[in-house]
Design a protein with these regions (language model features):
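Short Lys/Arg-rich amphipathic alpha-helical segments
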Residues: 92-96, 109
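Conserved catalytic cores of phosphodiester-cleaving nucleases, focusing on short active-site segments
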Residues: 69-71, 76-91
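Acidic-basic catalytic patches of nuclease active cores, encompassing PD-(D/E)XK
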Residues: 16-61
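Short connector loops at helix/strand junctions that flank enzyme active sites
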Residues: 64-66, 77, 97-99
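Short, well-ordered alpha-helix to beta-strand connector turns
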Residues: 52, 99-100
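Helix-rich interaction surfaces within compact, conserved domain-sized segments
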Residues: 2-32, 101-103, 109-156
Length: 156
């Protein structure tokens, strides 16, 4: 029998000085049985970094046609597609064609991946890539509690 997803409660107190966003948000998120704590942590970071009222978690690992997070318009167009991890160049190209803006938070051992994917991504005008430092990610993901409370301040 398949293992069920693990449910987490996430409370985010967000202060984004650059965009004048001051929000307190509560979410219930599911962690797929095959999803690592690091991947879930990067999804939460992406939620904080790109937050807006229309941003939603995708089905992620259980549906390859959906991103980790996305922002949709009221007429169901995808405005912002957010991936996490190390997708291949074909996946990034495919994602970029379905949205106005594509963002990727990459993590893990990036040296080989970077050499293969970044040259292709540089030719895609609507793709933006940021790397999450592994040491910080490991600290955040270690012993992830079922109730997560983050205070995040963003400033350039």
């Amino acid at each position: 029998m398949a293992q069920p997803s693990t449910t987490y409660k996430f409370e985010l107190n967000l202060t984004d000085l650059d965009r004048s966003v001051y929000e307190s948000v509560k979410q219930t998120i599911a962690r797929h049985p095959s999803e690592t704590e690091e991947r879930m942590t990067v999804r939460l970071l992406a939620y904080a970094l790109f937050y807006n009222e229309q941003l939603a978690f995708g089905r992620g690992l259980s549906d390859v046609d959906e991103p980790a997070l996305w922002e949709k318009s009221l007429d169901d167009r995808v405005l912002h597609w957010i991936e996490v991890g190390q997708p291949d160049a074909d996946r990034l190209t495919w994602c970029s064609r379905r949205t106005e803006r594509t963002s990727l938070l990459a993590y893990g051992s990036l040296r080989v991946w970077e050499g293969k994917v970044v040259p292709v991504a540089n030719n895609l005008k609507n793709v933006h890539i940021a790397a999450v430092p592994q040491e910080i990610l490991e600290t955040l993901a270690k012993d992830m509690p079922r109730v997560i409370k983050w205070d995040v301040m963003i400033s350039e």
